[in-house]
Amino acid sequence: MKICTVRIERRLLRYRSPIPTAHGPVGDRWTVLLALEDENGHTGLGEAAPLAGFTPDSVDDAEAALHRWASDDSSGGLPDGSPTARAAVDSALLDLAAQVAGTSVHRLLAPDSPDRLAVAALATGATPDDVAASAAEAAASGHVTIKIKVGVGEVDADRDRVAAVRERVGTDVRIRLDANGAWSASEAQRGLERLAVYDPEFVEEPVAGLEALAALRLTSPVSIAVDESAGSPKEVARAVSMGAADVVVLKPSALGGPSASAEVAARVRDAGLDVVVTSLLEGSVGIRAAAHLASAIGALDPLPGLATASLLDEDIAAPCRPIGGMLYLGTDGVGPATD
């Protein structure tokens, strides 16, 4: 396989409304689309989608790293200096290799992997009623796991949102929480004691930092998931060794791509922990790459957090939106089977 053409282009992601996080709202943002074309006309796609608070690089860093990689004929590897640029190249090369082989990326990596996967939805809204309505809509459309952002206000307000969602969706739907490291240790302990009655599946990043997570896990009534506090393979290994989490959230777009993420997942599972593959709120190119990874490594329960294309008004590719709570994977590279 010889790469004949490399195209690098900034694209704008537009969201239906800003997505609240403890790092601030995520609104319209730039991402970088990478296209690699071989001598037979196959085109592999990758996406570099840096996000402040979640990745160490900026969109300028990612774009510059991709241009350096493209101009270095002797490289043959992945870009330096930007994990999201590495993710874009790794994803594009896998897409291209699968097309050449006449199969999908997930079947290239694991021949017996499933071509569909249930995914968790993110409920959003400004008030408890708004969040509950969003969750109810997701549940009615077929989602059986729903994520709620907490830590964006007072603990009592978090409790009101979670209570409203649980009342609307009932007990058959799983709820997971994400605080993005916003709580102090005392706030997290108090908040989780109040929220445990609503039976959350786990809480992502209730406090920031691996030491704080490890300490909280000793007394938390809710399972702990590590996310942005372990944003690199080295940090994930440290989180596991410290006992900082029950669950490890893997964002392929932040970890350097599907290949690196698969290696990290294997080490996490060897230690007896669960992994959850999620998006970086990127466009559908990155989401599809993450979905194929989740299928290939069997990271199907807890459900992947990959329904986020539904939050976009303007995407960079054919939207990778769930149908009936499921993503359907294509048979040629990374898709686009699902609509």
Question: What name fits each language-model region?
Answer:
Residues 48, 205, 306:
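Active-site donor-binding loop signature of nucleotide-sugar glycosyltransferases
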Residues 2, 142, 199-202, 243-244, ...:
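Short loop/turn motifs at secondary-structure junctions
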Residues 42, 69-76, 246, 273-277, ...:
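A short pocket-lining beta-strand/turn micro-motif at the edge of beta-sheets
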